[in-house]
A protein has these predicted regions:
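Amphipathic coiled-coil/heptad-repeat helices and related helical stalk/stem segments
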Residues: 49, 71, 199-200, 231
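C-terminal substrate-binding subdomain of Rossmann-fold SDR/epimerase-dehydratase oxidoreductases
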Residues: 205-342
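Conserved GTPase G-domain signal focused on the G5
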Residues: 193
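N-terminal Rossmann-like NAD(P)+-binding domain of SDR-like oxidoreductases, especially those catalyzing
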Residues: 1-189, 239, 319, 331, ...
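Hydrophobic alpha-helix immediately C-terminal to the catalytic Tyr-X-X-X-Lys motif of short-chain
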Residues: 165, 169, 173, 203, ...
């Protein structure tokens, strides 16, 4: 049940968040110990975050600390007080569109906070840092599918820029201090206990309340929707794959997908982009209701399409996401109706 045959002590940041909650539950279910931190900020309903925590906290091998990543002293205490076998860093100020309107809030969590994570790993000998990047780093790229071997130097939102910065910072610490770091570019994650600011959640709520849904770029959009269980499986497997320096890396022909340092990047996505209008049709069928639609132009910071090249992930850990949206949306709707009693 436990790869390597022993129970690990794992720090999970953003443990009350959508992905962090599911990662913590998987680790605990498989016999590991989890120390979770989260600042429980009001970016979206803190009650949902507390309910997630309540379900994680029922396991005796879980310890929670309410803490902001930007709190340098608090973060130093966390690392000094425990010996971690791995850090899974999932905390961040999320939201592409939110970063356009509120740029300053992204600095503390996504940049300063990430530096504190790197410093903790450096000074306390953490064997592996796994951190969340994002498909948004591909920015203005139009070559499909998006590959980790492509350059990602043209972000179109501050959120994407902070995630790209995280990748650069992690690589720097891997190169300077030998800290094994793995970044995971998540592609449009959805599923039970999801974020209320994400499309599936907002569409579901609006349709059930009889309100219109906003559809950008007049519906001409595609997303590589990736079900939460597939994301968690990828994170879990990668956690046990500690990266090593690639002796074949050539600085005269630098490949972004590998490195002379113990640093790697992987996409986690299904490689099957779904048209937004089809996604909505599947949701309408699952809800048994039709949506009233507001057709709007493409928003700043948004992109028309995403599609993951997950071949590197599959080659590394023998897994690629596979839950179809028809199944994933049905599971989400069942959870939503049960949780909100509608």
């Amino acid at each position: 049940m436990i790869p390597g045959g022993y129970a690990m002590n794992v720090l999970v940041t953003g443990v009350a968040g959508f992905i962090g909650f599911h990662v913590a539950r998987r680790l605990l279910d498989d016999g590991h110990r989890v120390v979770g931190i989260d600042n429980l900020n009001p970016y979206y309903d803190p009650a949902l975050k507390r309910d997630r925590l309540a379900r994680v906290g029922s396991n005796g091998e879980f310890t929670f600390r309410k803490l902001d990543l930007a709190d340098r002293g608090g973060m130093e205490e966390v690392f000094a007080g425990e010996r971690f076998d791995a850090v899974v860093h999932l905390a961040a100020q999320a939201g592409v569109r939110h970063s356009i309107e509120n740029p300053h809030v992204y600095v503390g969590s996504n940049l300063t906070g990430f530096l504190h994570i790197l410093e903790g790993c450096r000074h306390h000998g953490v064997p592996h840092l796994v951190y969340a990047s994002s498909s948004s780093v591909y920015g203005a790229n139009t070559k499909m599918p998006f590959s980790v071997h492509d350059n990602v130097d043209h972000p179109v939102s501050l959120y994407a820029a902070t995630k790209k910065a995280n990748e650069l910072m992690a690589h720097t610490y891997a190169a300077l201090y030998g800290i094994p770091c793995t970044g995971l570019r998540f592609f449009t994650v959805y599923g039970p206990w999801g974020r209320p600011d994400m499309a599936l959640f907002t569409f579901t709520r609006a349709i059930l309340e009889g309100r219109a849904i906003d559809i950008y770029n007049y519906g001409d959009m595609q997303r590589d929707f990736t079900y939460i269980d597939d994301i968690i499986e990828g994170v879990y497997r990668i956690m046990f794959l500690i990266p090593r320096a690639d002796p074949t890396w050539d600085g005269s022909r630098p490949d972004p997908g590998t490195s002379f340092a113990p640093s790697r990047i992987y996409n986690i996505g299904g490689s099957h982009p779904v048209n937004l209008m089809h996604f909505i049709e599947v949701l309408e069928k699952a809800l048994g209701r039709q949506a009233e639609k507001n057709m709007l132009p493409l928003q700043k910071g948004d992109v028309k399409a995403t599609c993951a090249d997950a071949l590197d992930l599959e080659a590394a850990v023998g897994f690629r996401p596979g839950v179809p949206v028809e199944e994933g949306i049905q599971r989400f709707v069942e959870w939503y109706r049960s949780y909100y009693r509608v």
